[in-house]
């Protein structure tokens, strides 16, 4: 299977990891704030 545009796959991977990073930061912020205000 040949991929004529490997750059597009790299961009998609970076975008996906960026979304996962933001989601992780959001979850950690919620847990941290609930731990502080409890």
UniProtKB/Swiss-Prot annotation:
The keyword Chloroplast applies. One of its GO terms (biological process) is photosynthesis. It is found in: Plastid, Chloroplast thylakoid membrane. The keyword DNA damage does not apply. It is a single-pass membrane protein. SUPFAM superfamilies: Photosystem II reaction center protein L, PsbL. InterPro entries: PSII_PsbL (IPR003372), PSII_PsbL_sf (IPR037266). GO terms for cellular component: chloroplast thylakoid membrane; photosystem II reaction center. Keywords: Chloroplast, Membrane, Photosynthesis, Photosystem II, Plastid, Reaction center, Thylakoid, Transmembrane, Transmembrane helix. Belongs to the PsbL family. One of the components of the core complex of photosystem II (PSII). PSII is a light-driven water:plastoquinone oxidoreductase that uses light energy to abstract electrons from H(2)O, generating O(2) and a proton gradient subsequently used for ATP formation. It consists of a core antenna complex that captures photons, and an electron transfer chain that converts photonic excitation into a charge separation. This subunit is found at the monomer-monomer interface and is required for correct PSII assembly and/or dimerization. This is Photosystem II reaction center protein L. It comes from Ostreococcus tauri.
């Amino acid at each position: 299977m040949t991929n004529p545009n490997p750059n597009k796959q790299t961009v998609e991977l970076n975008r996906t990891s960026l979304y996962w990073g933001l989601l992780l930061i959001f979850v950690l912020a919620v847990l941290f704030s609930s731990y502080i205000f409890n």
